[in-house]
Each structure stands twice: as structure tokens, then as C-alpha cells.
Amino acid sequence: DAAKLAEKDLNGTARFVGMGGAMGALGGDITTMGTNPAGIGIYRSNDVMTSFSFSAYGAESKYDRETFNNDKNRWSFDNIGFVFSTKVGNETPLRYVNFGFNYKRSKSLYKNMSMAGFMGVYGDRPVSQANYMAQQATDAAKYVWDSYREPLDYSNRNIYSDNEAGWLGAIGFQGGMIEKDSKDENLYHPLNYGEPYSVFNSREQGGVGEYDFNIAFNISDRVYLGVTVGAYDVNYKKYSGYDESYDNDEGYLLDSYSKIKGSGFDIKLGAIIRPFENSSFRVGFAVHTPTFYKLTYATSARMTTDYKASTGDWDRIIVDTYDYVGDMERDYRLNTPWTFNVNMGYTVGNSLALGAEYEYEDYSTMKFKYPGNEGGGDMEFETAEAKNCLKGTHTFRLGAEYKVIPQFAFRLGYNYTSSAFKDEAVKYLPSNSIMTDTDFSNKMSQNVFTLGIGYRGSI
């Protein structure tokens, strides 16, 4: 989830998207205040801009020679902003002081996914989520016994309020999918129902909104400086349903609900230099501080188990954590990586514009912290997981715009972003985790091609 919040989509004005976002050194576009703040210094007049988009999301899953497709279409409001340009003078070193504001959809988190199939057998044991339940229950019980010399009672309805108990193990025990060892009360085993046929579905929605406030300076029409203060709003929800059914029609369904809400801020600094007086070539640099997020994670889970009783009759167990603790909430702080950006731009008259950018972020440096009322110290496990599972990313952006006439332009862009995940990265739930969704997806390297046409007139 942290990687999702730290990533940013290619989004903004139609011109910015059409050129692949490679406008850091070219400037003159409202969206550049979020990449290279100095780009607003290029403006010599006021500007107002807004954009909408229609997106078609598709997810294809393949498992056990079957293919599952999930498509979703939606309209979105992508950005709105303005620039207020103030001329200082023609002969003074400081020529313009410009102010800007822009809202954009920094990250869209809409995605649906599904897959199904037989899970197979590993060694002499069927592959099942119940194995994970039993392992977590065992790890937590042994830790509590070794630390406090007390047993962990998974049958207690207050178990979901115990900071040492993992929810996956607790709901598995209360839902009848794992049992305690007859000789060792700190050891748990999955009930052996055979190889399961599993069905998985997930729905994700929400995103991150970015509000940028900018001031930029034009010095002698050769040097442009800018600073942007960004504010962020996070609203993300996820549902996942995981079902296992067996030959005798027994089985269970685990519904997991989670959401993340919060806010954050960052500071972006940028510069653009036109090194040759008689050339339009520009080179730019930008650095973004980490985004400092204050977040709240909330979750609940519901497990429904259908089984045959010893009498031969069907019975059902329903365990709903919401009945015991409502939405369990955890407050935390997240610091995303620093961002370093180098960009170049070149124009040929008023008809052709070319841009190129390179950007680096090291996701392994992300920090998780406890909230201030809990001491504000590092969350060591989560921070270590980020270091072990994530790595630095390299992003290359290329863009071009050709104006057939002053009002009409063709645009072309390309982005490449390397994966933030190491090859061996997996989702690991510690023994006291309140998460019950065990699914995860590691985003691979990404290639994005953009094509656009634009018409710009005056009112």
C-alpha cells in the first residue's frame, strides 16, 4: 500500500499528458509546478486550465490455464489550476514573479481483479490459506507464551483487541478452519479438507489528490527558479473475497475490508537555466522532499464457514470482527522517498517543442513511524520490509509537440518506469497483524505511450 501511495500517475493538462510529462525544462504549463516548479516562471501572462478524462481500466489474470478479465470505465476530473503572472520590469534582473495553484489527481487506485482454480499440493499438504492461518496462530501463541508465560486464547471474543494476536489466525480458529494441537496448546494445525478450489475477487477504489501552491521567478529571461508546496489528500478503499471449497462441498469465504485515509505535504524546488543566450535550449533540475503523510488504516473481516456436522447435517459458522471491535483503526506516519529530476527542453521557432527527463526515487528508503501520541518512533518491522522488498526506480520521459498552425498541435510522448519491487518481494503478515487479506501484486516495469492533438484559442 505504501508503494501505491508514493507512485504518481501521468496526469494533468492535455498538453502535459500528450507530451508524456516531459515538460520540466520547457515549462509554460500549469502541471509542471508538480514536477519542476521553475516551469511556472516561463509564463508572461495569466492562465487558467482544467481537464477531464475518460479511462478504461482493464486487468487480466491467468491461472491454471484459465483467463479472467475485469474491465472498468469511469470519467474523472483530472486537474484545475491557474497562474497569475506579474511583470516586474524589462531592464531589471528580476523580470517576472508568478504565482500558481493546481489541483490534480496524483494517483488513481481503481482496479478490479479475479481468478480461480485448484491450488495444488505442496509436499504432502494441500496449498490452502488455512496453512497461513495456522502458522500465524502458532507464531503469536508461542511469542506470548515465551514473553509472558500466558496462553493466547483464540476462542475469546476479545481476541481482536489483543495487540499480540493476529487476526488471520484468530478468525481461522473461530471459523473452524484450524485447530489446537492435542499435546501442545501453542501449536495449531489446519483442518485437512483436501485440495481446495479457490475463487478470489478484489475491488479497489479511490486515489490521491494533490494541491500545489507555487511561486516562480524569471531572472533576465535566462534563469528561472520556483518552489511548490504540495498538500495531499488520501482516500483509498479495498475489498477482497477469498473462497475455498472442497470435494465434500465444505468450505469457507473470507471477506476483508480495508481503507486508508489521511493527508500529507511536501516541498518541491526547481530551476531552469538557458545557458546560451542565442539558443532556446534549456536544462532544468528539481528535487522533491518526501511526502510526509499522516494516515489512518481501518479494517474489518467476516468469515463464513459451511461444514457437515457429526450428525450429517449442514451447519454454518459466521465470524464478523465488526461485531466485536467495529472498524479497527491504526494511525501511522509514512515518509515517501526523495525525488530527483533532471530535464532538458528545446524549441524550434514557435512550431516544434522537444522535452526529455530523467527521475530517480529510492522506494527502499521509505519510513514508517508511530503517531506522535505513541512516541513518534520508527515502526521497525514495516520500515525493514520496505528496505527488503523495494528498490530505486528510474523514470525516463520523452515528449514532442508540433504546431501545424499556431492554434493546432500534434503531441507525442513516451514514459518508461522501472519496477519498485525486488524480484523476491512478497507480502508478509507478522504474527500480530490485523490484516486478513493475503493477496498482493508487484507492479512490473511500465511503458506508456501517449498521443494527442490540441487546439488553443483565446477568449
Mark where each language-model region is.
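Outer-membrane beta-barrel porins/channels
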Residues: D1-N11, F16, S85-I459
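Outer-membrane beta-barrel translocator/receptor signature
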Residues: A14, L26-T35, G41-G120, G206-G209
